[in-house]
Design a protein with these regions (language model features):
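Extended alpha-helical targeting/anchoring segments
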Residues: 116, 120-140, 144
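Residue-level signal for inorganic ion chemistry
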Residues: 47, 67, 122, 175, ...
Length: 284
């Protein structure tokens, strides 16, 4: 079994639990995922099966989410699963939210949440946070927010639904918290759904149930060329033999990383200097 899988992770379980379930269904150990989703979050979890795991790092890294947040509250985890407190601040107006979102577009600096898996001095931040040792100098990261569109705002209940398209490494919880701080009312994340990741959409995602079979997984597999945005180089018999041995061979192609195809099947990832191709990861 070889390829990618677009899994709709339900809320309430970890991304690793999805992998464990797939291993049980398929009997295959070589399964991995890209872009961890917190237990609270649901939606698209890109999964690689078999030697497709060698290609996980080459999946497109941009993502899109729909997040539901509530103003008038604060939390140490920036979501409803943490220690939540009411701020008793006046109700936030839509115009304030719109102004705050302007500052969260394009390339921005973002500080990861204290409860996150980011490393800090050899430890995960969440480990320090659980020990009550939250650093006050967590380094910021540059991220890109391509879109933050208001889908709905319930003024009475102070609940905002927002669509966010962003780069790798973006913490939606931080976006929520920062917007809460901008309005001075505080805000916590209530729900999070990833609607797109690695060229996979939530409309096409499969849900894993107790009835899901190995054949169901097999029929849902996605070919690497459909989700990885790299040029494809077609090979002849001679090139194929070179690839099997990991040998460099002469062939004009685009410069950079390329996917190698033989008989309409992706067999390797390679690097090209324009004239010669060197296999990097053989997938057979």
């Amino acid at each position: 079994m070889f390829g990618f899988l677009n899994v709709n992770k339900p809320s309430g379980i970890t991304s690793h639990q999805v992998i464990s379930k797939l291993r049980k269904i398929t009997g295959i150990k070589q399964i991995g995922h890209a872009g961890t989703l917190d237990p609270l979050a649901c939606g698209v979890l890109p999964v690689a099966i078999g030697k497709a795991t060698k290609l996980l790092d080459y999946l497109p890294s941009d993502k899109a989410y729909i997040v539901k947040m509530q103003f008038g509250k604060r939390s140490d985890t920036y979501d409803i699963e943490g220690n939540v407190e009411e701020t008793n601040y006046r109700k936030v107006m839509l115009v304030e939210i719109e102004k705050g979102l302007v500052f969260q577009r394009g390339k921005v600096k973002q500080i990861p949440p204290a409860f996150s898996a980011v490393h800090y001095n050899g430890k995960r931040l969440y480990e320090l946070a659980r020990e009550g040792k939250i650093p006050d100098d967590i380094p910021s990261r540059e991220i890109t927010i391509y879109e933050n569109e208001i889908l709905n705002f319930d003024f009475d209940n102070q609940i905002l639904e927002l669509k966010v398209a962003c780069s790798k490494g973006t913490y939606i919880r931080t976006i929520v918290n920062d917007l809460g701080e901008y309005t001075k009312a505080g805000a916590v994340m209530c729900e999070l759904t990833r609607i797109n990741s690695a060229n996979m959409n939530i409309e096409d995602a499969i849900s894993l149930t107790d009835e899901t079979t190995k054949d169901d997984i097999l029929s849902a597999l996605i070919e690497p060329k459909k989700v990885i945005d790299l040029p494809i180089v077609k090979l002849n018999d001679e090139h194929y033999k070179k690839v099997l041995n990991g040998n460099k061979f002469k062939l004009n192609s685009e410069i950079g990383d390329v996917l190698l195809s033989f008989e309409d099947k992706i067999i390797a990832l390679a690097n090209s200097d324009g004239n010669y191709i060197q296999p990097k990861k053989v997938l057979l």
